[in-house]
Regions:
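Structural motif
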Residues: 9, 17, 32, 66, ...
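NAD(P)+-binding Rossmann beta1-loop-alpha1 motif at the extreme N-terminus of oxidoreductases
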Residues: 1-49, 102
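Phosphate-coordination loops involved in phosphoryl transfer and adenosine-cofactor binding
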Residues: 2-5, 60, 78, 106
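Amphipathic alpha-helical segments at domain termini/boundaries
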Residues: 19-24, 58-80, 163-173, 179-184
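Conserved N-terminal Rossmann-fold NAD(P) cofactor-binding segment
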Residues: 28-78, 88-90, 94
């Protein structure tokens, strides 16, 4: 499986950070939000950010922007679609419904949630849709934090999960770990434990 284009839905701190990190690796990204104005402002924040999110300001050309109503067709060509919207299950479920109706067959769909169990995120998906669905929990700031948690579900195509892990390690420079669906995933659990020690 090759990842040659990515769509990110949600252009807040995490969506923007993931977009910047992908474009640093020369992966074309489309950043979608409720309005093109919101995603355009996010692209401008990426360009001006301190510390810099981009390794080279010219990399910004790898990021296109749009909105989830007029520009959603880009999902049909994407190899990986990342959901990075607000942590509300009802909103995430609506986004997934729209993604799975429009994505190309076999495209990976992932959530950047930091705490919602994958069982809840995927409860309304078909078994076939679950094969291509996982959590990709990037840490903020994405460019500077090496850890990436990939949380799998019981229906995943494990070869696809392994391909995604290798892409994130080799192309994005992440220390990717594959986790089971446990509360808070691994990174948050270790963080809470460390604060208590």
């Amino acid at each position: 499986m090759q990842i040659k284009s990515v769509v990110i839905i949600g252009s807040g701190t995490m969506g923007s950070g993931i977009a910047a990190h992908l474009c640093n690796a020369n992966v074309p990204v489309t950043l979608l939000d409720l309005s093109t104005d919101i995603s355009t402002k996010a692209r401008e924040r990426i360009y001006k950010s301190r510390p810099p999110l981009l390794i080279d300001k010219n990399k910004i050309d790898n990021i296109k922007v749009g909105n989830i109503n007029d520009d959603f067709d880009v999902v049909k060509e994407a190899d990986w679609i990342v959901e990075a919207v607000v942590e509300r299950i009802d909103i995430k479920h609506k986004i997934y419904d729209k993604i799975f109706k429009n994505r190309k067959s076999g495209a990976i769909v992932s959530s950047n949630t930091s705490s919602i169990p994958i069982k809840i995120l995927s409860e309304h998906l078909t078994d076939d849709e679950k094969k291509d669905f996982c959590i990709t929990h990037f840490f903020n700031p994405v460019r500077y934090m090496g850890l990436l948690e990939i949380v799998k579900n019981e229906n995943n195509d494990l070869k696809k999960i392994d391909s995604l892990k290798k892409f994130c390690e080799n192309e994005l420079g992440k220390g990717a770990i594959v986790c089971n669906d446990t509360p808070g995933f691994l990174g948050n659990r270790i963080g809470v434990y460390a604060m208590q020690v």
